[in-house]
Amino acid sequence: MTPLSMSGAGEAQIIKKIGGKEEVRSFLEKLGFVVGGEVTVISEIAGNMIVNVKGARVAIGKDMANKIMV
């Protein structure tokens, strides 16, 4: 497993684990980041990422991307 922040643009990944405190995991789940779900990195600039999850584009910071393991 590696953090989502290490994935390159255009790579579809399956979410294997979501770390962090309960409120962080709950927040990410509401955005569509769930274990077993697919996430694709659209772009990455200075550690901040735009990803496609459940058909929607979502911007997340590097700290959040580090909590999502693929």
Task: Label each residue range with its predicted role.
Residues 1-35, 40-70:
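Compact, glycine-rich, soluble single-domain proteins
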